[in-house]
Design a protein with these regions (language model features):
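Short, well-ordered loop/turn sites that connect or cap secondary structure elements
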Residues: 104-107, 113-114, 119, 133, ...
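Ferredoxin-like alpha/beta domains used as RNA- or RNAP-binding modules
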Residues: 1-101, 124-209
Length: 209
């Protein structure tokens, strides 16, 4: 998706879902179009729920069917709240963890790194790292993620050494800045400042209709 199109989506959703530092929403926090600044919509409950759903879909780069399956699975499980289950599924995707560890500037960039084979994963029960090229690959507690050593010499990681020194990952992740290695310490919860900007409960209600 082109930058201009993505940032129009950001402005329409009133949230920077592209993750870019120069996102147009930061300069123009109102919908696109000649009447964008003055535009006011009388929001219904359904409209609000739809808006929240769209935010998360674009934020995590999900297809409609994929996102619906995430919600349906979260509604079926009994081990945690539905909101926590949804957040857990979204945040423990390999592309998102790659982004959260600071290995990529945006989720879209992290998705590309995974697709192109730059990211390796080691399951807690295994001894060796293996290449994983599936962005939606679900990670578990104890799993480790690292950048393929040979890839560090390539273009996508040109400024990583400088940027990663300033990066602070969320508390549920551990980051080894010297080894470009991350580990899942625990699962994220909706009580943390992760889902700021969108309402998971509204999204669950939307799909529960």
């Amino acid at each position: 998706m082109r930058t201009t199109v993505t940032c129009k989506v950001c402005r329409r959703l009133r949230m920077s879902v592209c993750g870019r530092e120069k996102c147009a929403f930061k300069r123009k926090p109102y919908p696109p179009g000649v009447h964008g600044k003055a535009f006011r919509r009388a929001g219904s409950e359904f409209g609000s729920q739809l808006m929240e759903k769209q935010k998360v879909k674009f934020l995590y780069g999900l297809r409609e069917r994929q996102f619906r399956n995430y919600i349906m699975d979260a509604l079926k499980q009994k081990t945690m709240t539905t909101s926590d289950a949804v957040l857990n599924t979204l945040e423990t995707r390999l592309d998102n963890v790659t982004y959260r560890l600071g290995f990529a500037p945006t989720r879209a960039a992290a998705r590309q790194l995974v697709n192109h084979g730059h990211i390796y994963v080691k399951r807690k029960s295994l001894t060796n790292f293996t290449r994983v090229t599936i962005p939606s690959y679900k990670l578990k507690i104890g799993d480790e993620v690292r950048i393929r050593p040979e890839s560090l010499k390539k273009g996508p990681f040109g400024t990583l050494e400088i940027l990663i020194k300033k990066h602070t990952p969320p508390v549920w992740l551990e980051l080894d800045r010297e080894g470009y290695l991350g580990k899942i310490l625990t699962y994220p919860t909706s009580g943390e400042d992760i889902s700021k900007g969108y309402n998971i409960s509204a999204i669950v209600e939307y799909y529960s209709r």
